[in-house]
């Protein structure tokens, strides 16, 4: 086992990794920007090193600064968390060259899955179902039109190098294609420094389903089942749950076995998430793979009793899957997670500032992952996520009731949060009945006369 790990992240996920380190008897080293000097991840780490000013490019995304901190602290490994440098293959390579273990997959696999059209090709070759679409990068809007005619409208053009809805456009007819193609290309180039696009058939009213896997460095891959992530706004997830009401036990087993075989074939290791769109006929189509721990990993932890972050660390330290899991995966009950963001619940504008009161809920089956606290300051420089409220219950109905109760008891004052939005979602009849898709939030907000 490692003696010391540096966490190349901040706030909630950094604190989550620190908890795992402490339980494994590993010393945790935090890094922080000047804006995060009073953050809880700094307080609870065994060591903490300031790596620069508040701006991401000068601190958390500054690879030389992060590696320098790791060398100063003499760490064995680096855990990247999610976001920031977590899926940066160059960062993983620099860790390797510096003699520091990167807690994640090999750089070449991260790079493969980061180039979306190559990931599609690799998964198609391995037998994973994908949507009809282009083969490789599309060079021009003329070539895009040729593919669109083959696939059939509507289609969606996507940035090869990115995600989160940027560099993405839905095209419903031939007349729209040139303008939307150029707009997606420009947005992708601005967001990711790479304007490459590919195309897929667009699925109307899909669900967003993802599967969690763990793979050791000895060839063993295990599926931990799926998460339902369809409640999202502008491709940003708001609420997740496990299991999905639309995935049967037979589907769960079939897809899980297929993914384990596919990932073993490409030499994948550590935690990973494979994302799918589900069409109206409940067929799953691969869209991308995230080669890191996900924000929403707690819902899987709650229904499987597997600590995914501790598993990541153990796998990176060379443990075999039989020692990591200590038995077969068994799913119990239902879990829901609400992302609490520092945003106006109707306008969705960021809400930085001092938290004047903070009282997270408790009780049976309730978990709160957060680095926020009373009198703490939410800086304006970073992602708006301040807490994740997670519940577990015997079934979905009880989980909804428990989450509703927990939201009512979650006090955050001094800043706006999305807690009121989550209360309204949990009370919605369609949500409670499981009648939703990725367009649910837009329809929900339009129905209530709120902003989208």
Q: What is each model feature region?
A:
Residues 57-58, 110, 167, 297-299:
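A generic structural signal for short coil/turn motifs at secondary-structure boundaries
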Residues 7-26, 48-50, 71-73, 89, ...:
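ATP-dependent carboxylate activation and anion-phosphoryl transfer catalytic cores
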Residues 147-156:
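Acidic/histidine-enriched active-site and ligand-binding environments that engage anionic O-linkages
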Residues 1-125, 138-146, 395-398:
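ATP-binding N-terminal substructure of ATP-dependent carboxylate-amine bond-forming enzymes
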Residues 133-134:
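Conserved beta3 strand of the protein kinase N-lobe
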């Amino acid at each position: 086992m490692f003696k010391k790990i540096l966490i190349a992240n901040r706030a909630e996920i950094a604190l989550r990794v620190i908890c795992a380190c402490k339980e494994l008897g590993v010393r945790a080293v935090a890094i922080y920007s000047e804006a995060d000097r009073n953050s809880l991840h700094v307080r609870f780490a065994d060591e903490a090193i300031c790596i620069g000013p508040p701006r991401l490019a000068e601190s958390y995304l500054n690879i030389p600064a992060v590696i320098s901190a790791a060398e100063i602290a003499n760490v064995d490994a680096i855990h990247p968390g999610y976001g920031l440098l977590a899926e940066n293959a160059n960062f993983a390579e620099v860790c390797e060259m510096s003699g520091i273990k990167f807690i994640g997959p090999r750089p070449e696999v991260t790079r493969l899955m980061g180039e979306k059209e190559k990931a599609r090709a690799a998964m198609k070759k391995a037998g994973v179902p994908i949507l009809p679409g282009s083969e490789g990068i599309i060079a021009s809007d003329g070539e895009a039109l040729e593919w669109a005619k083959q696939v059939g409208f509507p289609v969606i053009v996507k940035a090869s190098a990115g995600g989160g809805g940027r560099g993405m456009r839905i095209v419903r007819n031939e007349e729209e294609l040139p303008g939307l193609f150029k707009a997606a290309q420009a947005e992708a180039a601005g967001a990711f420094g790479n304007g490459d696009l590919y195309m897929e058939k667009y699925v109307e009213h899909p669900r967003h389903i993802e599967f969690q896997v763990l793979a050791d460095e000895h060839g063993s891959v295990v599926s931990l089942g799926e998460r339902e992530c369809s409640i999202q706004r502008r491709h940003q997830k708001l609420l997740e749950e496990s299991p999905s009401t639309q995935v049967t036990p037979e589907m769960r087993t079939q897809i899980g076995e297929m993914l384990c075989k596919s990932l073993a074939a490409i030499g994948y290791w550590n935690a990973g998430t494979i994302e799918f769109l589900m069409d109206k006929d409940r067929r799953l189509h691969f869209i991308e793979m995230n080669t890191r721990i996900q924000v929403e990993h707690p819902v899987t932890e709650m229904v499987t009793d597997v600590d995914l972050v501790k598993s990541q660390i153990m796998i990176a330290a060379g443990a075999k899957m039989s020692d990591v899991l200590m038995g077969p995966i068994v799913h119990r009950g239902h879990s829901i997670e609400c992302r609490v963001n520092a945003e106006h619940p109707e306008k969705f504008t960021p809400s930085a500032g001092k938290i004047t009161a903070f009282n997270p809920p408790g009780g049976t089956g309730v978990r709160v992952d957060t680095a926020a606290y009373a009198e703490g300051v939410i800086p304006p420089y970073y992602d708006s996520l301040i807490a994740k409220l997670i519940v577990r219950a015997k079934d979905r109905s009880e989980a909804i009731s428990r989450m509703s109760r927990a939201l009512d008891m979650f006090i955050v004052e001094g800043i706006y949060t999305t807690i009121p939005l989550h209360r309204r979602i949990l009370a919605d009849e369609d949500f409670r009945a499981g009648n939703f898709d990725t367009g649910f939030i837009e329809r929900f907000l339009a129905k209530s006369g709120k902003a989208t």
